[in-house]
From Swiss-Prot:
GO terms for cellular component: cytosol. The gene is rbfA. One of several proteins that assist in the late maturation steps of the functional core of the 30S ribosomal subunit. Associates with free 30S ribosomal subunits (but not with 30S subunits that are part of 70S ribosomes or polysomes). Required for efficient processing of 16S rRNA. May interact with the 5'-terminal helix region of 16S rRNA. The keyword Cytoplasm applies. This is Ribosome-binding factor A. Gene3D superfamilies: 3.30.300.20. It is found in: Cytoplasm. Belongs to the RbfA family. One of its GO terms (biological process) is maturation of SSU-rRNA. One of its GO terms (molecular function) is ribosomal small subunit binding. It comes from Psychromonas ingrahamii (strain DSM 17664 / CCUG 51855 / 37). Keywords: Cytoplasm, Ribosome biogenesis. Disulfide bonds: none annotated. Monomer. Binds 30S ribosomal subunits, but not 50S ribosomal subunits or 70S ribosomes. The keyword Cytoplasm applies.
Amino acid sequence: MAKEYSRTSRVSQQVQKELARILQQEVKDPRIGMVTISGVDVTRDLAYAKVFVTFLTVGDQTNDESLEGLNAAAGYIRRLLGKAMRLRIVPEVRFCFDSTLTEGLRISELVSGAVKADKTKLAASGRTEEDED
């Protein structure tokens, strides 16, 4: 049975904090822009870290370009991470786009549209929401 708060989860949280600081203060690649780290998954042996990111895109910049910039700077970011954290093995960083935010917004819009359509149908039929209950 695994511990409820294992070492890998603690390392994941610390990696997330340090990467957020590094991306904000150290990395100056214009392709990257505004990045939000939504989560970090570290393997049990701490060799790899999959970093889930979302972007606040500005202008013509796309998520693919920003992700390409992050993955190009992964070695430099790993070196800075090694300086910031006291680990015997610094995880190899891999950046992945996190689509949960956009999917959540899409689902929220679908639900809002369905509720609005139901209200217009009720109003058109002359009934109220209390009559339905």
